[in-house]
Design a protein with these regions (language model features):
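Short amphipathic recognition helices of helix-turn-helix/homeodomain-type DNA-binding modules
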Residues: 59-63
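Residues in the helix-turn-helix
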Residues: 18, 29, 58
Length: 63
């Protein structure tokens, strides 16, 4: 699933490890999501959206 996590992280000066710690997953999980190798669970998608104060639909594009 396409996403703009790298851009959102960069805007906040966050590393993958920083984001992973903030949402309670491993850095490898964030890396896999960013590279479109893993689709996050609904719970994780909500946690990511909350971290960036946006809607899930604004962050993830299923196309």
């Amino acid at each position: 699933m396409n996403n703009d996590l790298p851009e959102r992280r960069d805007e906040r000066g966050m590393s993958q490890a920083d984001l992973a710690a903030a949402v309670g997953v491993s850095r490898q999980t964030i890396n896999a999501i960013e590279r479109d190798r893993y689709d996050p669970s609904l719970e994780l998608a909500f946690d990511l959206a909350a971290e960036f104060d946006c809607r899930i639909e604004d962050m993830f594009d299923p196309n």
